[in-house]
Amino acid sequence: NRVPYKSAPETEAWVSDSIDVAKALGCKNILLAFFSAGDLRNDPAGKKEVIRRLKKVAPKAETADVVLGIESWLSAEEHLEILSAVGSSHVKVYYDLANATKMGYDIFKEIALLGAENICEIHFKENGQLLGQGKVDFERVKVSLDNIGYKGWYIMEGAIPKGMEVLPAYRQNLNFVSQLMKS
């Protein structure tokens, strides 16, 4: 995020190299984060350059069968505009529930709009709260994801209350997610 993909020349090689590394490790998804200096909100020139760069590297991702996942502050509609412009089945959205909620997006409509075919992974996250104790309605999220037929990864992230140690927090988060997935 300090060295933005939208403007730093060296990031083109980094993303290209990350495809080789992911393939060698057997990883299917690469997270491309667009925050801080890399933020694409209100930046048409930045979006245009990201699209240009992704179009250039997408064939390599396709050959390697590795997905480049965009995580950003953008809405589902804006993400779909980028995906459509790039035109590759190997460029998708790495959807972060807490970020989208923080932005005021209707995450249930966004999930339906994106569809399973455009989401590579989901961040289960509550900023500063344990999963299920913050603003995200995970029961509705699960129903929404089931409705679109999402079968990908769920990644627990950033769900630790201030002052709580990581291991106990993630044990509780894992228990919450396990129970949620059984419902």
Annotate each predicted stretch with a short phrase.
Residues 1-93:
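Active-site acidic/histidine proton-transfer and metal-coordination neighborhood
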